[in-house]
Amino acid sequence: MTLIAVIDYDMGNLHSACKGLETVGAVPKITDSPLDLEKADAIVLPGVGSFDPAVRQIRSRHLEKPIKAAIANGKPFLGICLGLQILFETSEEGQEAGLGIIPGTVRRFRSEPGITIPHMGWNQLDFTQPDHALWQGLPPHPHVYFVHSYYVDPLDSHLTAATVTHGSQTVTAAIARDRLVAVQFHPEKSSTNGLKILANFVQQVQKLALVS
């Protein structure tokens, strides 16, 4: 049984993420308990909404330290959408300090002719870490589902695992560092490709459990 703690911090509906994880064979547990994060085999941090309320909710529930400890200790971690953005230090969207786990900032798309903001709908990924386990078994340029006006800009470009292009702007769509992965798109809303990404994440968790 692969137990995955899905962090509840009142930032979006967690049902879709849980359903996706269940579909690929994991046992998700929605929780805001630091003890549950410690006991789980892996952690998923989803989220929809704005940067400042999100980090305030994380801190008011005393989840910042447990999240940082889990990542530092090598527990597999998947951030989704807002759950990617709040890992960064700052955001152009708000005033609060982010969790600061990934050096860098969150920036807003520039307005330009022919594009809409938010970037919403299906778009192609371009892999910059093509051999990463998260992408195993996917086509070279898979379509996934996005809804966002802001994107992450890591100081270390080597952390970028995939990019997406909106108009003339090519931005980070996923990051990977050790056992931390986080994506701007919604795998749970990305049909077959999204389920494959979730399955790859769960498979890596299971492999780790076998050797530990």
Swiss-Prot record:
Keywords: Amino-acid biosynthesis, Cytoplasm, Glutamine amidotransferase, Histidine biosynthesis, Hydrolase, Lyase. It is found in: Cytoplasm. Its main location: cytoplasm. The active site is at residues 81, 186, 188. It catalyses: 5-[(5-phospho-1-deoxy-D-ribulos-1-ylimino)methylamino]-1-(5-phospho-beta-D-ribosyl)imidazole-4-carboxamide + L-glutamine = D-erythro-1-(imidazol-4-yl)glycerol 3-phosphate + 5-amino-1-(5-phospho-beta-D-ribosyl)imidazole-4-carboxamide + L-glutamate + H(+); L-glutamine + H2O = L-glutamate + NH4(+). It holds the Pfam family GATase. It comes from the Bacteria. One of its GO terms (biological process) is L-histidine biosynthetic process. GO terms for cellular component: cytoplasm. IGPS catalyzes the conversion of PRFAR and glutamine to IGP, AICAR and glutamate. The HisH subunit catalyzes the hydrolysis of glutamine to glutamate and ammonia as part of the synthesis of IGP and AICAR. The resulting ammonia molecule is channeled to the active site of HisF. Heterodimer of HisH and HisF. NCBIfam families: IMP_synth_hisH (TIGR01855). This is Imidazole glycerol phosphate synthase subunit HisH. The lineage of its organism: Bacteria, Bacillati, Cyanobacteriota, Cyanophyceae, Oscillatoriophycideae.
